[in-house]
């Protein structure tokens, strides 16, 4: 499974690791992904998703149904 948020499609970022002498080498900044069981009110059940912590924060404000509709995700498949 790809390291990608299932709601926002957030993925890893290319960056540089900069040493003390300012030499730059490429590195990857991974997304902070967490497995979460979230209560889906419309479906009357829990849904298990792999979400970024940014998506979790947004989820508290918008709700799982609204975010899934924006992302075009059918929660019945999870």
UniProtKB/Swiss-Prot annotation:
One of its GO terms (cellular component) is ribosome. The keyword Ribonucleoprotein applies. One of its GO terms (molecular function) is structural constituent of ribosome. InterPro entries: Ribosomal_bL28, Ribosomal_bL28/bL31-like_sf, Ribosomal_bL28_bact-type, Ribosomal_bL28_sf. It comes from the Bacteria. Pfam families: Ribosomal_L28. GO terms for biological process: translation. Gene3D superfamilies: Ribosomal protein L28/L24 (2.30.170.40). Keywords: Ribonucleoprotein, Ribosomal protein. Belongs to the bacterial ribosomal protein bL28 family. HAMAP family: Ribosomal_bL28. NCBIfam families: L28. This is Large ribosomal subunit protein bL28. The gene is rpmB.
């Amino acid at each position: 499974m790809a390291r990608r948020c299932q709601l926002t499609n957030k993925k890893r970022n290319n960056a540089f690791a900069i040493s003390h002498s300012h030499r730059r080498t490429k590195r990857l900044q991974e997304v902070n992904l967490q497995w979460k069981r979230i209560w889906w009110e419309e479906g009357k059940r829990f849904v298990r998703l792999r979400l970024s912590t940014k998506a979790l924060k947004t989820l508290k404000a918008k709700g799982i149904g609204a975010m899934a509709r924006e992302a075009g995700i059918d929660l019945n498949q999870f």
